[in-house]
């Protein structure tokens, strides 16, 4: 094309943050020619009618002198995020994620932006409203208030998960500033400048264990890992250390080595809940070099940290899975703590990436050293280590300050024979808790179900109350007096006095137990004990998790009851008793990872007690005392568990011997959704690679969710990219109706739900 007909002197090929899989051309205005480069984050109009204040964010891939689309070309509107430029490794990672995880390029781009809502980097601070210092008592406080405006404010803050400014809160609750002032005076709420939300050093000491002297195994691990770090060669190391073996101290020494070499670090933890303790530990050692990234930060906070990391003002980033996409400069070390944890897999929204695997790929692209740390490695990672694909460093014993923990199994079948009913607590557990209370030691109780009663059923017709929108039994939450669906969050707050099916009155029975009931029973057994419950109900508002953990860590509570969030990586030196109330519950799920997840969970809970000089004890209640998974967890023998479990995986051809792709089809009409699923299934079967295998169609474990019916089938393959191409061709040929949606999940963590 004749360059004289080009309306711009320079053009940019970009990927737009939208659900499209195309690279688009935009013109570069003269005033931006010296600012736009490869990797620039820019603002572009996606439709011709968009005005200057309506735009999409895009990443620049290439600068060129001409375009074949001059008749429709539009200009780049401006640079974004203060002219931050993504490094080439992140651009390459966008393409890899799009290809591997079966998602449009535009969807992959969204992972690499701090927030699609923050228009530019800003150092301006804003006030946010939070619950007061006694946030965990808000439900009790509500019962004492008679002012409807104040009640409305507190209830709104209980339900919200994002920071609200005073004007936003007043608008949403229709109250005046006087109402907020009154709540502030009563210390029921706090109004805080966003700049003051960063953790101050003096607030961190209650989380920190005493730094031990490294033992020989730890020193060997540090030396092994440091070799690739010094050589600037890509290497993945599996750090397999029993609970309490001092993996964090190994991380610390390797990070020091990386910083001495001028390299930056990304440290991933599986959940936001763990970020506070990890941040506390490393901020004490590295101070302002450390930054944190996670979804509970405000848009401006997240953007500021992202900006500082890209400018080299922060050299250590800590956060959950999304932190792996931070554009930190001169990356040399990536650590994935608790690498086995399913929270590293994004399962709620596409792209359905696995952050552990993305970390390994980013390490490969940057010649960085990658550490995968765990006391219970995933079977995939352990297999890679045994086959020498990864290096293996083993910490086989607890650190010098820790005492070996004694683990005991309690056969609940025998307890039933004694009491002639199904008890929640064995007599052994009751006595053991009493002993800890007498000497001032702490207890952790693990029970992986929320709520008070897990089901409500009719004694006459046997009907069980279910969510009207999901194939899910409703759970009774006593504190809020509601029946709640744990899938779609539907709440039934009106009292149900008769059976919806047979209309019988006085026939409804509340059965089962969740953490809320366990807490109530413990208060009945031990009325003077100070108990804390840690689950998604008590930690749903900002700051509540940290406040509860601090309360327990500083000895202001005796017993901590919680779901799986208490099993992960927390350090409480005064805890000498850990109790697993239902050690076998996860084994009843028909999923190929069920045994692995039960083993991991029990082992992680086991590691919460006896982490200091005090001896620890673990009690595991089970109705399956002969089950081999529980026996291996009891013995804390991962190699024995692996040896047994890997045989079953090989016979059934499941990971790590193959890769899985899960195709899920959703629609409002069950029959029609099934027919569409069958059409695509047939097309894939006709063209599938001979080395891959196609499983039959089945309903998903959660068949109906939010009024949509779910069907699925699995593909087993050793070449994900080839299989993805065949799926894409089948979907294109099928031309699915708009009434049915297809989700492709590569390397799923579950094949059932």
Swiss-Prot record:
PROSITE patterns hit by this protein: HELICASE_ATP_BIND_1, HELICASE_CTER
EC number: 5.6.2.4
Coiled coil: none
Sites where the protein binds Zn(2+) 2: 467, 470, 485, 488
A GO BP entry: DNA replication
Keywords for this protein: ATP-binding, DNA replication, DNA-binding, Helicase, Hydrolase, Isomerase, Metal-binding, Nucleotide-binding, Primosome, Zinc
Record's catalysed reaction(s): Couples ATP hydrolysis with the unwinding of duplex DNA by translocating in the 3'-5' direction; ATP + H2O = ADP + phosphate + H(+)
Cellular component terms (Gene Ontology): primosome complex
Cystine bridges: none
Domain Helicase ATP-binding: 228-395
Residues noted as binding Zn(2+) 1 in the record, renumbered to the chain: 458, 461, 499, 502
Subunit text: Component of the replication restart primosome.
Record NCBIfam families: priA, PRK05580.1-3
PANTHER family (UniProt xref): PRIMOSOMAL PROTEIN N (PTHR30580:SF0)
Primary role: Initiates the restart of stalled replication forks, which reloads the replicative helicase on sites other than the origin of replication. Recognizes and binds to abandoned replication forks and remodels them to uncover a helicase loading site. Promotes assembly of the primosome at these replication forks.
Family in the record: Belongs to the helicase family. PriA subfamily.
Protein's name according to its UniProt entry: Replication restart protein PriA
């Amino acid at each position: 094309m004749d360059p004289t007909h080009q309306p711009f002197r320079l053009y940019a090929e970009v990927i737009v943050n939208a659900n499209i899989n195309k690279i688009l051309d935009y013109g570069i205005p003269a005033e931006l020619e010296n600012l736009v480069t490869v990797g620039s984050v820019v603002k572009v109009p996606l439709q011709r009618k968009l005005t200057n204040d309506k735009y999409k964010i895009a990443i620049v891939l290439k600068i060129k002198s001409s375009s074949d689309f001059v008749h429709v070309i539009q200009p780049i509107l401006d640079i974004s995020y203060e002219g931050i430029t993504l490094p080439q490794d992140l651009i390459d990672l966008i393409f890899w994620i799009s290809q591997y995880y079966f998602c449009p390029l535009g969807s992959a781009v969204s992972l690499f932006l701090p927030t699609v809502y923050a228009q530019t980097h800003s150092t301006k601070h804003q006030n946010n409203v939070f619950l007061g210092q006694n946030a965990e008592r808000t439900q009790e406080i509500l019962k004492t208030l008679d002012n409807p405006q104040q009640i409305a404010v507190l209830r709104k803050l209980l339900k919200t998960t994002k920071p609200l400014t005073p004007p936003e809160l007043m608008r949403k609750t229709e109250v005046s500033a006087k109402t907020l002032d009154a709540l502030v005076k009563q210390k029921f709420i706090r109004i805080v400048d966003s700049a003051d939300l960063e953790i101050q050093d003096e607030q961190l000491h209650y989380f920190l264990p005493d730094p031990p002297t490294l033992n020989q195994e730890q020193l060997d691990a540090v030396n092994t890992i440091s070799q690739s770090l010094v050589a600037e060669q890509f290497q993945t190391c599996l750090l397999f250390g029993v609970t309490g073996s001092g993996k964090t101290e190994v991380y610390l020494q390797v990070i020091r080595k990386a910083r001495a070499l001028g390299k930056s670090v990304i440290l991933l933890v599986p959940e936001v809940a763990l970020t506070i303790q990890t941040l506390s530990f490393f901020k004490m050692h590295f101070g302002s070099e450390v930054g944190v990234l996670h979804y509970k930060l405000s848009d401006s906070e997240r953007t500021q940290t992202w900006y500082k990391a890209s400018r080299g003002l922060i050299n250590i980033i800590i956060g959950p899975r999304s932190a792996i996409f931070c554009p930190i400069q001169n990356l040399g070390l990536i650590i994935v703590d608790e690498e086995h944890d399913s929270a590293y897999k994004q399962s709620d929204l596409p792209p359905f990436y696995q952050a552990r695997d993305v970390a390994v790929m980013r390490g490969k692209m940057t010649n960085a050293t990658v550490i995968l740390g765990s006391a219970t490695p995933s079977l995939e990672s352990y297999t890679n280590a045994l086959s020498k694909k990864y290096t293996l460093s083993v910490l086989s014993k607890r650190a010098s300050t820790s005492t070996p923990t004694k683990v005991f199994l309690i056969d609940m079948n025998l307890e039933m024979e004694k009491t002639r009913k199904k008890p929640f607590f064995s007599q052994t557990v009751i006595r053991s808790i009493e002993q800890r209370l007498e000497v001032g030691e702490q207890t952790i109780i693990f029970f992986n179900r929320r709520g008070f009663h897990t089901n409500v059923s009719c004694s006459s017709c046997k009907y069980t109350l279910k969510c009207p929108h999901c194939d899910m039994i409703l759970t009774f939450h006593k504190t809020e007096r509601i029946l709640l669906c744990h899938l779609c969050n539907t709440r039934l707050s009106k009292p149900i006095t008769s059976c919806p099916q047979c209309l019988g009155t006085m026939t409804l029975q509340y059965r089962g137990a969740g953490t809320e009931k366990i807490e109530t029973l413990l208060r009945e057994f031990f009325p003077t004990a100070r108990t804390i419950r840690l689950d998604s109900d008590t930690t749903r508002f900002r700051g509540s998790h940290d406040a509860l953990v601090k309360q327990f860590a500083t000895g202001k509570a005796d017993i901590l009851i919680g779901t799986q969030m208490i099993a992960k990586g927390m350090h409480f030196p005064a805890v000498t008793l850990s109790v697993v109330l239902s050690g076998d519950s996860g084994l009843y799920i028909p999923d190929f990872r069920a045994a692995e997840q039960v083993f991991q969970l029990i082992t992680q809970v086991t590691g919460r007690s006896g982490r200091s000089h005090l001896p620890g004890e673990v009690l595991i209640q089970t109705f399956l005392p002969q089950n081999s998974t529980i026996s291996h967890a009891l013995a804390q023998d991962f190699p024995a568990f692996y040896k047994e479990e890997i045989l079953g995986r090989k016979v059934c051809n499941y990971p790590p011997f193959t890769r899985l792709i899960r195709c899920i089809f959703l629609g409002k009409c069950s029959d029609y959704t099934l027919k569409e699923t069958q059409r695509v299934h047939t097309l894939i079967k006709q063209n599938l690679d001979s080395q891959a295998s196609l499983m039959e169609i089945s309903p998903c474990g959660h068949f109906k969710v939010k009024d949509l019916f779910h069907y699925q089938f699995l593909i087993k393959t050793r070449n994900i990219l080839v299989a993805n191409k065949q799926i894409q061709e089948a979907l294109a040929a099928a031309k699915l109706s708009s009434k049915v949606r297809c989700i492709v999940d590569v390397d799923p963590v579950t094949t059932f739900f």
